[in-house]
């Protein structure tokens, strides 16, 4: 039987932007706030995170930021990062799923 990725509550994160793309500093603050508030998992680049309008580079930036920030978490609880990789193009969805895994996403 497969083990569950997480139990509890996951936040579907909105992705903050500035004139240069993903606002990494604000995104890190938002992720740290979620973790310190006790969230069990984080969803990055889902429909709440504007994934359908993000470029591939913006998605990569958001995924890297989330994975790195969650791994900096000093509590004993690991916060899984789940990435929305859906697309209306099957090959793009597969490519993004493989890329998300390579970048350290959990699901």
Regions found by a protein language model. Give the residues of each.
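Active-site beta->alpha loop and helix N-cap motifs at the rims of alpha/beta catalytic domains
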Residues: 2-11, 15-107
């Amino acid at each position: 039987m497969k083990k569950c990725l997480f139990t509890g509550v996951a936040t579907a994160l909105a992705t903050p932007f500035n004139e240069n793309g993903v606002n990494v500093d604000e995104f890190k603050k938002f992720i740290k706030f979620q973790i310190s508030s006790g969230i069990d998992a984080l969803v990055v680049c889902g429909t709440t995170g504007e994934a359908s309008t993000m470029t591939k580079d913006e998605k990569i930036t958001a995924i890297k930021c989330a994975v790195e920030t969650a791994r900096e978490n000093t509590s004993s609880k690991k916060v899984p990062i789940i990435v929305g990789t859906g697309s209306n193009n099957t090959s793009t969805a597969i490519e993004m799923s493989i890329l998300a895994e390579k970048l350290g996403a959990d699901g």
